[in-house]
Amino acid sequence: VGEAPKAVFMENSTQGMATYCRYLESLRQKGTTGVVVMNGNPFTCGHHYLVEQAAAQVDHLFVILVKEDRSMFSYQERLDMAKRGCAGFDNVTVCEGSDYIISADTFPAYFIKQLSDIAETQMLLDLDIFAKHIAPALGVSFRFVGSEPSDVLTNSYNQLMCQVFPGTRIISRLTDNDRVISASAVRCALDHSCLKEACRWVFPTTVPFVVAHLATKALRQELELTPKPGLVDMHDRGAHQDMDYQLMAKSISALHPFFVRLATLGHADTLPDTDRIKAVGQEAEKAMFQATTGVNTHKGALFCMGIAVVAVAHALYTDTLAIAPVRQYIAAIAQGFGHETGTHGAEVLRQHVVQGALDNAVNAYPMLF
């Protein structure tokens, strides 16, 4: 499939590369065409700028996402981000990724960021496969990459690309106050749970994914907090005989895509109506029960976090991210919900005359803010 001075890349199937190339051939466009290969972890204003600059130089531009799931955001999320971020271009097609371009098979050093003789061999293999198979299948004459002033490995890859594929064009990275806009800076902000800082450099259509990421991260942090007497933690079931750490973790993963959808609803100039929020919430609840085979692991958390996700996404869209506006949005959303009847929680509220999850939301969580 590919070769470098010190290695060859082979596969034991006649369908793998051929199948992917047939897929790429089905996407071919007339005129001068080019391609951008990106990880998009997550899709930033810098990625959008690269696509914008590249698309202006060709009749049609293809964007291929790195398929390997070794990133903060999953491949499917990154693919969705790229499609949303590139939707405003008439001459851009976002393509499915494959194991044949910047993957653990062709270029594993990319994911550990260590430059070595082995890494150079891997880069040459990856680029040889691109030049021999992927570029001809798409019919592209140019490959566009962003300049890389700080990452030695990626910079070396770009320089080798210029040698292997003459149609390589390096585009200067977008900067903000002399600082290069990078996905790594966004990830650093997310690692420190700095929402506003993270959203500063992501493209607007990426914001819902950032909000959802932090919502899911919060649920995982709560689960991993150990010990928690009476509650499920990493070492104990607590008072819950029908659930454990693994089941709770599975439930959180099942809920995550719905946090993206809820944040997308909220990321608009007006708050979404309650019925739309309820519909997504009901789908999320169904997915949770499917993942846990009927165990209620996060129904309450889904309600509270779901409302918060919508409110925070709306605050980011309207540039009103502060405690008072977010509380206002939470209360406004909660007021559209009616009290449940016929549940254990509803019976407890009736007997003991205490406030439940909905009442706390309507009051914008006074115990938290």
What are the roles of these predicted feature ranges?
Residues 1-207:
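Nucleotidyltransferase catalytic core that binds NTPs
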Residues 2, 54-56, 61, 309-323:
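Compositionally biased, low-complexity linear motifs
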Residues 111, 307, 346-350:
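Acidic/polar active-site rim loop that often engages polyanionic ligands
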Residues 151-155, 177-180, 304, 311-313, ...:
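Short, well-ordered, mixed-charge alpha-helical segments that flank or form enzyme active sites
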Residues 182, 251, 301-308, 364:
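Catalytic-loop motifs flanking and including active-site residues across diverse enzymes
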Residues 207-270, 274, 312-369:
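Phosphate-rich cofactor/ligand-interacting catalytic cores and adjacent structured alpha/beta frameworks
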Residues 257-310:
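Long, hydrophobic/aromatic-enriched structural stretches that serve as scaffold segments
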